[in-house]
Amino acid sequence: KLIVDEIEDIRVIASGSSSFDLLNKAGEPLVGRSTLFHLTPFSQKEIAPTETTLETRQNLESRLIYGSYPEVVTLDSFERKTDYLRDIVGAYLLKDILAIDGLKNSGKMKDLLRLIAFQLGSEVSYDELGKQLGMSKNTVEKYLDLLSKVFVVYRLGAYARNLRKEVTKAGKWYFYDNGIRNAIIGNFNPLSIRQDVGALWENYLISERIKANYNEGLGKEFYFWRTYDRQEIDLVEESSESLTALEFKWGNKKTNVP
């Protein structure tokens, strides 16, 4: 604040891996004088100028398994990518995040992340997660709120025109980066022997849409949609001008539109 107030025509860039921690330390004194940018892992649109269409196709499996953190994209072997992601999960997720809010139970945080990772794209409620983990609903909500603020996971609510229902219905949880998700469950196996390829594909594409929203300032809101008879659409994008529905499938099988 002192620098901005005292030095004319200066721009200060404050960055950090946690928006929560950064805003607590620098945000309030700079209200009205700052612009906030969300820097996610690389989007495919950012990577595209550096590779051919053929290379993009060849690298798709790596993106689904190892994700798109800048360091991961540039590392030259799967072994080094794996080691890097394990380091992030071990050193950052289970230490730095807990320190941000004075939390102490790293075991419960890890169990919650693993549960979310294994239920990728499935509807879950705070109550349900709490019962499975032996935690209170409020503790689960607090942990997931913190994980959202540090850009590890994000929640999609159900699309409904009743705003109360949008907030209270069970939601779906996704990871900003596939590599982090796979590191949490310790699975870097190739797609040919995995049972979760569809979930990885869905997580990857929805995250790409979220990244575009941040990077291009589109101002969209994101939901999923489901009827009482279990018909479902993976992603609903709402802007001030339009409503767009997207369904993501891995493979060539034709599906019926709900």
Which ranges hold each PLM region?
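Conserved AAA+/SF3 P-loop NTPase catalytic/coupling segment centered on the Walker-B
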Residues: 1
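AAA+ ATPase "lid" subdomain C-terminal helix
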Residues: 5, 72-78, 138, 151-154
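Short glycine-/polar-rich loops that comprise or flank the Walker A/P-loop
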Residues: 8-10, 31-35, 241-242
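Interdomain motor-coupling "hinge/lid" segment immediately C-terminal to the ATP-binding subdomain
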Residues: 17-125
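A short acidic, leucine-rich amphipathic alpha-helix
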Residues: 127-131
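Short amphipathic alpha-helical interaction segments
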Residues: 134-149
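A cross-kingdom feature that marks ATP-driven nucleic-acid transaction machinery
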Residues: 145-152, 157-258
